[in-house]
From Swiss-Prot:
Catalyzes the attachment of glutamate to tRNA(Glu) in a two-step reaction: glutamate is first activated by ATP to form Glu-AMP and then transferred to the acceptor end of tRNA(Glu). It comes from the Bacteria. GO terms for biological process: glutamyl-tRNA aminoacylation. A motif ('KMSKS' region) lies at residues 242-246. This is Glutamate--tRNA ligase 2. It is an enzyme of class 6 (ligase). It is found in: Cytoplasm. The gene is gltX2. The lineage of its organism: Bacteria, Pseudomonadati, Pseudomonadota, Alphaproteobacteria, Hyphomicrobiales. GO terms for cellular component: cytoplasm. Its EC number is 6.1.1.17.
Length: 449
């Protein structure tokens, strides 16, 4: 790769980022990481009514949670002068022309075209307006919106994901670049920014393929270098529905608050719909090494929350204490007990936050379940003296087995119910020393402790 790549992720701060946004953000950031390039975070905040500072701040925070730290950052709202200059250049070249139709007029025109079996594309009627007609519209209070005059030709490129691709621009309406109120739609600011900062690779969802035909012509009209384009498959719900910011439970913020690990979200967002086996990858560098745009599937990539649960659990089961000690402390686990507790319970966790329930089992209060009072009373008499250690459980259960003849489930389940109040959980050989003799005695006696 000749030049050091510069890629970008450009969300609109009109809602919280969701798992579908994470895919292009990660593909870009990991591509830059692998190729020794840079990553630009650009806020496309030209929608003045819907863009908010809350969502802008949240976007940066959520990307940081995923491990994405931009090398460059800017907002489009700070760069209007650049867009104004580009728009004037296009007007002077005859590529940006004023139109005065109302939305209702355009809708009626589209319906007439469809009724005649014609494609519903803009007919360029505004190009035939005389100066007098334009003046009359403006005297009537109409302000023009501005369309980019497309060359009616095929735009072709070698897509980084899809291979040889093309768009026949003769089948497209001339796109509106400037609204009647003077604000800009997505297309012109995006091209101006990419050209001005030198974006080399535009990696985005396949829903932008048609936009690429338009944008290539815009780059050329502005005498700017055309970047390489790659259009990846989109994440959908498990049912095949498109993801949107309205799906709050799949927002990155909600996933973080629900206790998912960023590595699990990263791995699933990137590897789903690729040639790689979907598996948890903790290291960003390792995950970056697996990003091969040419091997992404053309089929939609289905995001299944159940798969995320499994991925998260696999990560948690392998986590060392160093990765979780602060979170355990926040749950009330003292430093001196943290290692033994974590090693005891992590294989039973789906999320680190689930450890809170097991700390309560250890620390109490627990209401015991005494399913077999006589058996538990005999077992209590055989409970070893303090201090408890790794061999205490085996020594105790061997003694109980010899005394009562109980074995297997008949031996272990009544003891588990009495000590934890539950019929499942971590290995009691590891839990019993954490519970301690005093609590064990009280629970075996049927007391809440």
């Amino acid at each position: 790769m000749a030049a050091s790549p510069l890629v970008r992720f450009a969300p609109s701060p009109t809602g919280f980022l969701h798992i579908g946004n994470a895919r292009p953000a990660l593909l870009n950031a990991l591509f830059a990481r692998r190729e020794g390039g840079r990553f630009l975070l650009r806020l496309d905040d030209t929608d003045r009514e819907r863009s908010t500072e809350e969502f802008a701040t949240a976007a940066a925070e959520d990307l940081g949670w995923l491990g994405i730290e931009p090398d460059l950052f800017f907002r489009q709202s700070d760069r209007t002068a650049l867009y104004d200059t580009a728009a004037e250049r296009l007007k002077a070249a005859g590529r940006l022309y004023p139109c005065y139709e109302t939305p209702e007029e355009l809708d009626r025109r589209r319906k007439r075209q469809l009724g005649r079996g014609l494609p519903p594309i803009y007919d360029r009627a505004a190009l035939s307006l005389t100066e007098a007609e334009r003046a009359a519209f403006e005297a009537d209070g109409r302000q023009p919106h501005w369309r980019f005059k497309l060359d009616h030709r095929v735009v072709a490129w070698n897509d980084l994901v899809r291979g040889e691709s093309h768009v026949d621009c003769a089948s497209l309406s001339d796109p509106v670049l400037v609204r009647a109120d003077g604000s800009y739609l997505y297309t012109l600011p995006s091209v101006v920014d990419d050209a001005e900062v030198g974006v080399t690779h535009v990696i985005r969802g396949e829903d932008h393929v048609t936009n690429t035909g338009v944008q290539v012509q815009l780059f050329e009209a502005l005498a700017a270098a055309v970047p390489a384009f790659g259009h990846h498959n989109l994440l959908t719900t498990a049912d095949g529905e498109g993801l949107s910011k309205r799906l709050g439970h799949l927002s990155l913020r909600s996933l973080r608050e629900a206790g998912y690990e960023p590595a699990a979200v990263r791995s699933l967002a990137v590897l789903t719909g690729s040639a790689e086996a979907v598996r948890p990858i903790a290291s960003l560098d390792e995950l970056a090494g697996l990003v091969d745009l040419a091997h992404l599937s053309r089929a939609p990539a289905r995001f299944d929350p159940a798969e995320l649960d499994g991925m998260n659990a696999r990560l948690v089961h392998d986590m060392p204490l160093e990765a979780v000690h602060e979170r355990l402390a926040a749950l009330g686990v003292p430093a001196e007990a943290a290692e033994a507790f974590w090693l005891a319970v992590r294989a039973n966790l789906g999320r680190v936050s689930d450890a809170a329930a097991w700390w309560q089992v250890v620390n109490g209060p627990v209401t015991p379940v005494i399913a077999e009072p006589d058996f538990i009373a005999r077992a209590a008499d055989l409970l070893p003296e303090a201090p408890f250690g790794p061999g205490t459980w085996k020594a105790w259960t061997d003694a109980v087995k010899a005394e009562t003849g109980a074995k297997g489930r008949a031996l272990f389940m009544p003891l588990r119910l009495a000590l934890t109040g539950l019929d499942h959980g971590p290995d009691l050989a590891a839990l019993l020393p954490l519970i301690g003799r005093e609590r064990a005695v009280r629970r075996l006696a049927g007391e809440t402790a």
